[in-house]
Amino acid sequence: MVDSLNLRLALTSAAMLGFRHGLDYDHIAAISDISSIQSKASDAMRYGLLYVGGHATTVAVLGAAAIAFRISLPPASDRWAERLVGITLVVLGVYVLGTFFREAPHNHLRPRTRITLLINGLLWIYWRLGRLFGGTRVEAPQVFKDGYGTGSTFLVGIIHGLGAETPTQLLLFLMAVNLGGTAAGLLGLLTFIAGLLLMNTLMCASAAGLFSATLGRPFALRTLTLLTSAYSIVVGTVFLLGSAGKLPSLTG
């Protein structure tokens, strides 16, 4: 009876931890970036959920390996994963900032993928520096102007999921294993992912609705785009410096 009660408490804690984990700084920045460059709320929601799905996939694979085989990523992986996330956020933030200076930031024929955004962001920086130092090219170079596929959005979610394996999270899963076996540990993992998906889905819906509501209000849209870019660049820089752990908790 005691073990059964403790198991239920462990599963509930895993679900709550997943819900809280969904409200991390990098999730807010990434989902906001995705929403800010889409022309329709449905596209913002779809691409946001692709990112969320990639993140959840990484959590599922790493969590299952830890539970079933007691395998986890080496401690050093946290450092390079944190910096990799920082790079994606800084480059995407700079790209979103570029849309702030364009007359029609949402005039895409098709939503652009995350890798397309990363490449075009770097090309835009290169073009802008060239213009400052005497370059004559009028139009910024771009690749895949109309966007191709959705796999890159999913891939960036996978990258961002590499930093999700926390000691507290693993301790809960292993506690569930001790109380109810491997099956209970996997159930704890599923409840964690369910909490994560719930929070991130709410975030995607909120971001999609917010940006969609500003499409007919140019000043509000440009202000929101500027704030999104600034937030992404600042958070990305913090991650690049390896200081994400010093950020205050958003959930208390």
Regions found by a protein language model. Name each.
Residues 151-177:
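Active-site-proximal loop/helix segments of hydrolase catalytic cores
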Residues 63-88, 98-105, 175-186, 190-193, ...:
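Transmembrane-helix boundary and interhelical-loop signature of multi-pass inner-membrane proteins
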Residues 24-27, 55, 90, 165, ...:
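Divalent metal-coordination and catalytic microenvironments
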Residues 6-75, 170-187, 205, 210-211:
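Juxtamembrane transmembrane-helix termini in multi-pass membrane transport proteins
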Residues 43-135:
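Membrane helix-loop-helix hairpins that form the core translocation module of multi-pass transporters
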Residues 50-60, 154-164, 224-232:
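Select subsegments of transmembrane alpha-helices in polytopic membrane proteins
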Residues 2, 100-161, 219, 247-252:
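Alpha-helical multi-pass membrane helix bundles of inner-membrane/thylakoid proteins
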